[in-house]
Each structure stands twice: as structure tokens, then as C-alpha cells.
């Protein structure tokens, strides 16, 4: 009996510690919870040159965010001169480039002047690293080992847009899921992580552009995958792609990612084009919930590209033009707004603070609340359009030419 009790105690301790260990990884776009938040409480608030642990050169160009697993950082880049798209691996400890592997070589796609050819953030489960690029009119997805060996590469579908490609994949159990909104076909595709074969596919009939990453969270008592695409906001079962609910509108296209407010139980999404509107939806419904579960709508503060963030019941968003807004998440009431500088990067949060970076690499640290409260400021010293990552008390920022590691 004592032996059994001891084993149960050890198991309980392991299960207690495991979430904390997992939280140290930043495995995909916007981190472990997909919303830009970190449980890390040991991060620097204000910093200068003395807080830069290392600064490593990044070859080529790209706007993808770094992802982190254990002692490794993964990043994508493109070499326009040779038309190569590349996966990079750095050592988290000192920023040393451990390896780089070409993913594909293909003609450069059409894109917006502010977009790049390596804008999709990788995803990793600690066994493989998954990347996606546009090659010609094909969406190519590849999986590499942690040591940089190609495991598989598949065509997931086609893509056509004047703005270029930038959809980031997310992981759910043994599936890699990608939202592709394209003029040549709009769809959500789930691939098996082991071999890249298709697990399921959701076709979207309107063929509208979408760049929003799927958001997976337990809401209203069940796991839901919220996808903003094709003139609507929809929730699916990520296991099999079955539709749970949908809310039509408020616009045709979406770029920023959904977020969730635990306090009010609302999932909040902003449309991008032709109208920027926040929708806050109660995710407990089924079928068409357009007229029954949309709790509030708000035009002011709705972002085009940067994803918003929720901290302690406050919704912070920043427009591409550079106006930072704070809304009450449960009601959509705008509490304040403040000029912050034009930006594409999405904010992150930790320890009750929000870290927001504009395109100049200027970082403002804010305590969300009913009035604007700036806690600190910092600067990278170079242009930066990528969203940062957080792991083990350190920030990882991608600038135009370098990857920065910042600590206390």
C-alpha cells in the first residue's frame, strides 16, 4: 500500500510540474496558448544594451516569428537572389547557428510591399519542426527532424493572392492544421504529423483571402478550433473538422488571430477587409449563431494585421497605422487609445504586463487597465516586423537582420 501511495505521489508531482515545463516552450505562432501570453514571471521589464544576452545575424529576409523547444530556436528565411526558402536552427543558449536547411526553391510569388517570402511561423512538437511556404501556386508543407533532416514534404493545396503568403500552421495532438484563404480556393487542411497525409479538409466556398491562424482552446466545455475565413467566423472540432457553430460577417477577409477572454467566456475576432470590426462571440452555441451569440461589436480599435491580446479582462489591440487601444473585453467599451507608431508585430504579455513593439523596433511596456499606464520602454535598434517569443525568462525578438535574446 505504501509502495502504491509513493508511486501515486510521484505521478502527481510529475503532472504538477509538467505544465510548467511545457510552458517554457514557445512552440508555434503566439506561443503555447496561441494568444501571445506567457506564464513566465521572471522577465525583464525595462532593459538596455546590458540586457542583450546575444545578438545573431539572420541571413536573407523574412517576417516569421521564432519558435522555441528546449534548447533550440527555429526560424524561417528567404534568399530572394537564389529563390530559396530556408529553415534555420539556433542554439537558445548562445545564439549559435546550428544548421540551416533549404525547404524549396521556386519562383518568388506576388506579394504586398510590406510582406516577405518567409512570413509563416514554424511549429514544433519537440519531435519535428513543421514549415510552410508558397512555391509557385502551391502551398508546400514540410517536416524536419530536430537535427535538420527532411522527414516529409507535401503539397497541401494551392494559393493565389496579390498580397503574398503568410498563414502559420498550428498543432493539435497528431495533426498539423493550416488555414488557407485564397482566390484559387479557400480551405482548412489538417495533415498527419507523422507522414504529411491528409486527415481532413474543410472547403470554403467563397474563396476569400484569409491569413488568420486557427485558434484552439477549450471553450464552453469542449475543445474548439476557431477559424476566421471566408466571410465568417467558424468553430470546428479539431479532431475531425466537424462544424460546431458559425457567425456570418462582419467582413470578407481576416488577418489577425482570434483571442479568448476567460473571465467573460467570449472569443474575440477582428475582421480586416473591407471593414475592420471586432466581433465578440459566446462560443456555447451550435449551427448559425449570427443573430443569437454575437455579444458585442466594435469598430474602434479593430486591427487589420496585428493580433490583439487579452490580459485580466482588458483587450489590447493596435492598428497597423499605430494607434493602441484598450477595450473592456466583456463589453467592447473603449477605455483609452494612444499613438504607438506604425506596426505589424502582435503584442505579447507576461506577469500582467503587455509588451508592444512598433515597426521601428521600439518597445512599450504597458499595464492594462482603465487608464493608460506605461511601465517602461526599450528599443532593439533596428526595424522589426515579426512578433516575439518568450521562454525561460528571456525575450526573443527578430529584427530586420538579427535575432535578439534579452534577459534581466
Which stretches of residues belong to each language-model region?
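Noncatalytic, solvent-exposed loop/strand surfaces
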Residues: 23-408
Amino acid at each position: 500500500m505504501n509502495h502504491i501511495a509513493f508511486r501515486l505521489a510521484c505521478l502527481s508531482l510529475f503532472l504538477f510540474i509538467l505544465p510548467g515545463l511545457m510552458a517554457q516552450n514557445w512552440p508555434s505562432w503566439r506561443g503555447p496558448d496561441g494568444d501571445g501570453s506567457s506564464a513566465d514571471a521572471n522577465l525583464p521589464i525595462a532593459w538596455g544594451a546590458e540586457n542583450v544576452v546575444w545578438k545573431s545575424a539572420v541571413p536573407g529576409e523574412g517576417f516569421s516569428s521564432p519558435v522555441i523547444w528546449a534548447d533550440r530556436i527555429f526560424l524561417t528565411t528567404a534568399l530572394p537572389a537564389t529563390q530559396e526558402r530556408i529553415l534555420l536552427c539556433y542554439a537558445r543558449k548562445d545564439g549559435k547557428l546550428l544548421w540551416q536547411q533549404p525547404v524549396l526553391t521556386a519562383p518568388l510569388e506576388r506579394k504586398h510591399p510590406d510582406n516577405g517570402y518567409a512570413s509563416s511561423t514554424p511549429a514544433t512538437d519537440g519531435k519535428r519542426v513543421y514549415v510552410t511556404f508558397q512555391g509557385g501556386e502551391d502551398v508546400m508543407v514540410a517536416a524536419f527532424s530536430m537535427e535538420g533532416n527532411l522527414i516529409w514534404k507535401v503539397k497541401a493545396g494551392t494559393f493565389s493572392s496579390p498580397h503574398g503568403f503568410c498563414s502559420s500552421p498550428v498543432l493539435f495532438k497528431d495533426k498539423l492544421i493550416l488555414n488557407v484563404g485564397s482566390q484559387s480556393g479557400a480551405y482548412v487542411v489538417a495533415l498527419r504529423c507523422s507522414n504529411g497525409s491528409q486527415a481532413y479538409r474543410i472547403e470554403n466556398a467563397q474563396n476569400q483571402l484569409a491569413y488568420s491562424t486557427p485558434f484552439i482552446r477549450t471553450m464552453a466545455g469542449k475543445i474548439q478550433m476557431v477559424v476566421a475565413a471566408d466571410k465568417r467566423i467558424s468553430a470546428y472540432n479539431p479532431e475531425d473538422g466537424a462544424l460546431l457553430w458559425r457567425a456570418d460577417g462582419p467582413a470578407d477577409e481576416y488577418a489577425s488571430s482570434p483571442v479568448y477572454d476567460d473571465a467573460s467566456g467570449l472569443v474575440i475576432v477582428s475582421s480586416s477587409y473591407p471593414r475592420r470590426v471586432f466581433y465578440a462571440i459566446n462560443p456555447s452555441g451550435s449551427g448559425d449563431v449570427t443573430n443569437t451569440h454575437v455579444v458585442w461589436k466594435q469598430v474602434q480599435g479593430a486591427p487589420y494585421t496585428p493580433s490583439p491580446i487579452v490580459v485580466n479582462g482588458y483587450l489590447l489591440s493596435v492598428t497597423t497605422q499605430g494607434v493602441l487601444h484598450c477595450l473592456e473585453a466583456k463589453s467592447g467599451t473603449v477605455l483609452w487609445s494612444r499613438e504607438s507608431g506604425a506596426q505589424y508585430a502582435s503584442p505579447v504579455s507576461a506577469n500582467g504586463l503587455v509588451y508592444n513593439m512598433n515597426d521601428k523596433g521600439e518597445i512599450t511596456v504597458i499595464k492594462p487597465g482603465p487608464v493608460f499606464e506605461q511601465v517602461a520602454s526599450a528599443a532593439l535598434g533596428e526595424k522589426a516586423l515579426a512578433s516575439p517569443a518568450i521562454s525561460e525568462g528571456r525575450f526573443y525578438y527578430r529584427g530586420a537582420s538579427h535575432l535578439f535574446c534579452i534577459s534581466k
